[in-house]
């Protein structure tokens, strides 16, 4: 296989360069997107990943049309024969109502979504970055930043091998391989770069080391998921249930059943911290209780569960800022870019990676450090232009649905109204025409524009 970084022919080992134009820490969707676009522009990019592929990530595995657009833009083929399972839209169940909403037909986004497990998805996107010319190093843990003693600016990272004797590809057409500088597994070494992108997830130790902490005034979600063998594996809608309860109180979150198309389904639930129940919820017990209400023939039982129940935090609405400081740019979960409306973070991770790359490309083309820095300082504003007002609306939304009475009212009176629900789907998935469009598009875009940025 020769597409997206899987190179044919013999590989040869060479020693790694200790520097690059840009170091990207984390080869998830955001980091790999940034690395791809930077490498395509001809920059020397070192993409560092602490795990080795393939690896697991807690996720619903559902990809909205916004994420599909990013994949297409990276030249990734999305054929069902290659493991991409398409879907038509979302099915919502709640309050005795069941409604199917197709993804909107827009000129700006494809009219379909996909499902692909993160075990395969992340590697495909990372290999696309590798194929574009980025040097991908797997099994490498970043232990801290290298700082300029005078300015405090990040000039590189300190790394340590996981102990697997990792060998990593540089993405060259010949399939060259990059070996550790010191040749010893577990040895620390330093990589230097003009700029560093933090794409190291919700915990983002690199951001913390640079003094960037999470904001308590932004929403946070928690999601858990597992996998079952099930006859529902080939459902062509992403199914969501607004039926999570604490006693009789309806909670701000949803359960999901996403067919993967391979005989299995991703099943999980997510809850927002705007609920009074958030801190003391037993999520695994809630999942068991919810699944106990499902028809037996769907097969969601302990006997058909094929993976552990795993959980992860969902950092939302720019919950870590600033997104640029002293040579470090944040993308994806590291910058708290999960959509507060629906808990989806893959599309925004990939989009923010592309935005960061475009800012970096322009900045590094400047003739001096002062003008380069001026361009880099535009990155937070570029993110605010893309998401700021929309995320502020999202914060108001999650605050409202944190009240059980509001959640009950919205479910009872909103779901039976298809026109309202089509509007709601566009709002929650952030799927509108940027210019023109229908009345729903114009209303959503206007609200996002006039609302103060997050």
What are these regions (language model features)?
Residues 13-30:
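Beta1/beta-strand and adjacent pyrophosphate-binding region of the FAD-binding site
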Residues 30, 53, 203:
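Conserved Rossmann-like nucleotide-cofactor binding loop
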Residues 39-59:
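Glycine-rich FAD pyrophosphate-binding loop
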Residues 52-74:
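Conserved N-terminal glycine-rich FAD pyrophosphate-binding loop of Rossmann-like flavoproteins
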Residues 68, 73-123:
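A conserved beta-strand/loop capping segment in the N-terminal third of enzymes
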Residues 83, 275-359, 365, 371:
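FAD/FMN-dependent oxidoreductases across multiple families
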Residues 128-297:
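Predominantly flavin-linked oxidoreductase catalytic cores and closely associated redox partners
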Residues 361-454:
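C-terminal helical "tail/cap" subdomain of flavin- and related membrane-associated enzymes
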